[in-house]
């Protein structure tokens, strides 16, 4: 086992003594230093092997990094070397924005959960693309997803303008693009999951992607990331709409607004999206409903509350083709990646 993997449980108490967002930044900086000095390079050669196909893309294993951990695409290579079969970075907006006031990230250790109200803080599309272009991840055979969103000050009626700018900017540099319409931290964003609003947005993205595919002579798959706080009727409507506009995959799910599982715990009443263990069951229900409605051919990425290999396998059993990790990495460290890949492989999925 890598020294890096062994070190994380020892470092975690010190990290958890810090403000959650500060610890996040310190961890990424430390990971980058370890990568730069070669401490994690050999992990790329020993990436867990559990070959899978997702949206037509060949993966070494079906365990990915969820968007949000590396919003600016500044740590792609260092993160990829932890053993992921694919890496997704962002969410990026056309223009730089600071996000919501700090503090805006809170741990709930008893629930193995996190609440964030970051609000798409990022350096903007130009800086994001420059970072992606510097990365060697794709050249080394890694699969890269780029996640796009809208600026906070863009009226919801003009949201499509931001997504079209984002798609055009990231298209040449992505193996797939994710349309994030489910963050609870951008006002009214989740309204885009509604039937009419979603259809209008996807119609424009479909046409723009066709134009970009012709220009760049390559087809880039498109995924849509949805919330866990949807009724069965809403899930069914989304499941029916996505194929109509040529969407290749769905990511289920983003964070939840529900606090039922953490009521009474410190920070439970903080505004923002709840991630981690309490989201697992919510995500499973959405995945199962999507699979039932969309049939066996749909590409579904399961994310939310994976803190063990068993939970990764449960996502696959519910109907996901692949999984993504974020909060689980904070509580378990990078060893979780290989554990999840091994569990999925052992189950023969």
UniProtKB/Swiss-Prot annotation:
The keyword Iron-sulfur does not apply. Pfam families: DHO_dh (PF01180). The keyword ATP-binding does not apply. InterPro entries: Aldolase_TIM, DHO_dehydrogenase, Dihydroorotate_DH_1_2, Dihydroorotate_DH_2, Dihydroorotate_DH_cat, Dihydroorotate_DH_CS. GO terms for cellular component: cytoplasm; plasma membrane. Pathway: Pyrimidine metabolism; UMP biosynthesis via de novo pathway; orotate from (S)-dihydroorotate (quinone route): step 1/1. It is found in: Cell membrane. Its main location: membrane. Its EC number is 1.3.5.2. Gene3D superfamilies: Aldolase class I (3.20.20.70). GO terms for molecular function: dihydroorotate dehydrogenase (quinone) activity. It comes from the Bacteria. Keywords: Cell membrane, Flavoprotein, FMN, Membrane, Oxidoreductase, Pyrimidine biosynthesis. Substrate binds at residues 71, 116-120, 180, 185, 254-255. The active site is at residue 183. FMN binds at residues 67-71, 91, 147, 180, 225, 253, 276, 305, 326-327. Catalyzes the conversion of dihydroorotate to orotate with quinone as electron acceptor. Monomer. This is Dihydroorotate dehydrogenase (quinone). It comes from Bordetella petrii (strain ATCC BAA-461 / DSM 12804 / CCUG 43448).
């Amino acid at each position: 086992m890598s020294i890096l993997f062994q070190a994380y449980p020892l470092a975690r108490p010190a990290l958890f003594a810090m403000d959650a967002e500060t610890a996040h930044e310190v961890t990424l900086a430390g990971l980058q230093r370890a990568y730069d000095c070669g401490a994690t390079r050999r992990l790329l050669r020993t990436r867990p092997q559990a070959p899978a196909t997702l949206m037509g893309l060949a993966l070494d294993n079906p365990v990915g990094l969820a968007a949000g951990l590396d919003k600016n695409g500044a740590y792609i290579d260092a993160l990829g070397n932890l053993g992921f079969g694919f890496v997704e970075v962002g969410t990026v907006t056309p223009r730089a924005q600071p996000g919501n006031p700090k503090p805006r990230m809170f741990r709930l250790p008893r629930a193995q959960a996190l609440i964030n109200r970051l609000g798409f803080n990022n350096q903007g599309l130009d800086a994001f693309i420059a970072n992606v272009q510097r990365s060697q991840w794709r050249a080394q055979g890694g699969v890269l997803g780029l996640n796009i969103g809208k600026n906070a000050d863009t009226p919801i009626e003009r949201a499509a303008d931001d997504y079209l700018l984002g798609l055009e900017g990231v298209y040449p540099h992505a193996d797939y693009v994710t349309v994030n319409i489910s963050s609870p931290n951008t006002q009214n964003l989740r309204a885009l999951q509604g039937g009419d609003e979603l259809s209008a947005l996807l119609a424009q993205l479909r046409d723009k992607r066709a134009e970009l595919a012709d220009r760049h002579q390559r087809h880039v798959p498109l995924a849509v990331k949805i919330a866990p706080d949807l009724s069965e009727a809403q899930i069914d409507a989304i499941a029916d709409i996505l194929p109509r506009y040529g969407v290749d995959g769905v990511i289920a799910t983003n964070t939840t607004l529900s606090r039922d599982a953490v009521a009474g715990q410190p920070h439970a009443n903080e505004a923002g999206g709840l991630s981690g263990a309490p989201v697992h069951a919510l995500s499973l229900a959405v995945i199962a409903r999507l699979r039932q409605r969309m049939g066996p051919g749909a590409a579904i990425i399961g994310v939310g509350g994976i803190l063990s290999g068993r939970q990764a396998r449960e996502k696959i059993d519910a109907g996901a083709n692949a999984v993504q990790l974020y909060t689980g990495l904070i509580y378990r460290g990078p060893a979780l990646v290989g554990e999840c890949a091994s569990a999925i492989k052992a189950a023969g999925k």
